[in-house]
Amino acid sequence: MTRLMKRIFTILVIAAAMIVAASCEKYEDGKPSKDVRSEFARMYPGAWDVEWERYGDGNWVVSFETGKRPDGTDHKAFYDRNGNWVQTITDVLLADVPQNIKNYLQESEYAQAQFEDYDAEYYETQAGDNFYRFDLVMGGRDIEVDVNTNGEVTPARYGYF
């Protein structure tokens, strides 16, 4: 091999190593159990930009993206220490929120409120009570409102995990 070929080969090897390192999962606070990682991989096989963080007493939250790079969809999935999925929160553009959900909001006491952001969050829960959460401004106050698929519009609920 010529000297130039050796340099090119070395540069390619370094570049490949950097790409592999950049695509690896990132772990905060240690590494989740194999059960947790396996359940996540089963549920979200195409996930990328994956970052794990311990949450509470041995539970885990994983932030990740799906879809086309570089502008994927942001998600956060929550797992208990045994690898059981608890909930996933997905960022959704307001334009992509189903019309019936928007209608429920417009027919509620929050009809005069303005959207604070250009997106909402979609919560999928283990119990199946899925809902959209909106950040609104009403009467000069910031409020969060949940709208479920049955048309119930309520102030934001907390404590799912």
Predicted regions and their residues:
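First exposed extracellular module after export/assembly in secreted or surface-exposed proteins
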Residues: T2, K31-F161
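C-terminal motif of bacterial Sec signal peptides marking the signal peptidase cleavage site
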Residues: I19-S23
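Bacterial N-terminal signal peptides that target proteins for export
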Residues: M1-I11
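Repetitive helical segments and hydrophobic/amphipathic motifs
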Residues: A15-A16
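Bacterial signal peptide processing site
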Residues: E25-E28
